[in-house]
């Protein structure tokens, strides 16, 4: 309702009441105006009524919601199901145009505005999380792996001779397949063991750059967030190598936005060397459904090139999800979640440490990994290979999700490449182990329930192992008794034969 509508309403209802309602509406509109003017995440989260008003105002700016609209094209925002239309708040046209995912659509001003605001809010949050000098970013409706592929395909046009991507090993399939899908040959750099941690082999990286030649290398593809005992790559040193040899640097920052340490590494890498783009998942960092990522970087023109590489229009669902989430939380709400995650990491670490010691195991010392933890499973692995994988199955059937058990010597072929010791990020890690992570949104009750169920599973596996050991002992003892009886029979037979003769 506008001013004229309220004035007309005063003829039907007491003007004092109408003016009060008008003031209430203005308070909602004031929040919306501040958002459009500043393009930053509000400090305090919005209530649902403000959010729904804002989304409704945007949606009616799209041509499919015009009163009396007549569409005669092949794509006019028609939706057969009213439920589907409501699910998307009647944003049907998606984002971008055929030549650029960030471009404005003439017949979808509301969706275009939604896209611009979302990208602006996400940029603000990335700065808040620790990468203060980021220049540009955009939300893309693909998960991390395909978003990395889009970055590699953009670099292809800038480096036509390149055929290799140097990749410090991380045993995660999608980031590996992102390079294969883009048509490049991954050059796997094995990690080095320093204490319990697996760290970047910088000498091997530089040696491979010199061996292959900088012109033949598309980029170095590094990683921040990862499963312990692997830790984030030495981003500063890798960024310096990239700057010295004029090689692009793409960072897989999948769930690193929630970690101040990961974001600091990216900021420092860009300060001392070269980082062209870093990619992060929406669902892992902002607690929204799977299917979106953020591509960000320090060179505005390069990020625009990546957005123009995306073919066709794109789904607005990931952008809408993260926009609603950030406006609901506000920057203070998101900062609170980051703080709670750090606290849960310390709590989870302490609880796993106590439990591991009770079973003669230990928490691996991985101080450079700010999200993931690992506990040894030596006592299980020494006795029976299947005991380690059995523990993982038991946890899963007891509704513990996210925990990973990593046995020794696992082999895995991914896109024609065979990895020894797959899941452990190295060919021969010294022991089997169990992973758990403290990610954004974790609560204390999650940790307590996990520790309780892990304790029960470890007891059950040990009890079964002990029973098998007893059974094996009994079988061995029976065989020994039979052999002794047979020998005694032979002695008695010989004695009888001697007496007879």
Curated annotation (Swiss-Prot):
Substrate binds at residues 97-98, 105, 313. It catalyses: O-phospho-L-seryl-tRNA(Sec) + selenophosphate + H2O = L-selenocysteinyl-tRNA(Sec) + 2 phosphate. GO terms for biological process: conversion of seryl-tRNAsec to selenocys-tRNAsec; selenocysteine incorporation. Residues 474-493 are annotated as: SLA/LP epitope. It comes from the Eukaryota. The modification N6-(pyridoxal phosphate)lysine is found at residue 284. Its cofactor is pyridoxal 5'-phosphate. Pfam families: SepSecS (PF05889). It is an enzyme of class 2 (transferase). Belongs to the SepSecS family. This is O-phosphoseryl-tRNA(Sec) selenium transferase. The lineage of its organism: Eukaryota, Metazoa, Chordata, Craniata, Vertebrata. The gene is SEPSECS.
